[in-house]
């Protein structure tokens, strides 16, 4: 198996066989499970997360701020500000999109420059925001979107006053990556 398939595939096939023989033993189709005494360990290669090159990130952020400057209507200006705040916080802290979308106003402390994140497994972590530009953008966003933030009780809201969804943020990232001419798949 190991020479034909990748370690994850081999593990999956063996797990399926183990489950099948356990089922057969449970319903007494067989007396003894042949996998009871077999212990197989596979070494899986450690895959490091992909990073976004600094030049690409700078191009991406400059595109967002260019779009913000090009915004003419109040609606476009408001959206551009929100988009800049979302992207800046994502890249400054490295939080997951789902964590960003679930942020409550009380989780974002811009006076002490930190964000409280409730991650997977209800783990709480406090992330410091050290970049002055990010803090400035977040403060501007908070002041501009104060009504929407209060109405939906989430820090990031859309124009209708509802919490920003994961999918909206992913579309936002794709939109600005396309505008910047970045072909690399962007995930914060």
PLM regions and their residue ranges:
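Conserved catalytic core of the tyrosine transesterase superfamily
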Residues: 1-188
């Amino acid at each position: 198996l190991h020479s034909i398939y990748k370690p994850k595939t081999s593990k999956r096939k063996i797990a399926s066989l183990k489950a099948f023989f356990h089922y057969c033993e449970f319903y007494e189709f067989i007396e003894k499970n042949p996998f009871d005494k077999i212990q197989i360990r596979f070494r899986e290669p450690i895959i490091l997360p992909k990073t976004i090159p600094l030049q690409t990130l700078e191009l991406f952020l400059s595109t967002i701020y260019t779009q913000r400057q090009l915004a003419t209507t109040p609606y476009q200006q408001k959206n551009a500000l929100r988009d800049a705040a979302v992207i800046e916080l994502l890249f400054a802290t490295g939080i997951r999109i789902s964590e960003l979308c679930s942020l409550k106003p009380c989780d974002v402390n811009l006076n002490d420059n930190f964000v409280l994140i409730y991650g997977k497994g209800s783990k709480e972590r406090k992330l410091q925001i050290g970049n002055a530009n990010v803090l400035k953008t977040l403060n501007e966003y908070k002041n501009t979107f104060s009504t929407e933030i209060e109405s939906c009780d989430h820090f990031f809201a859309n124009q209708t006053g509802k919490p920003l969804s994961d999918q909206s943020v992913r579309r936002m990232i794709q939109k600005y990556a396309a505008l910047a001419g970045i072909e690399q798949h962007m995930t914060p």
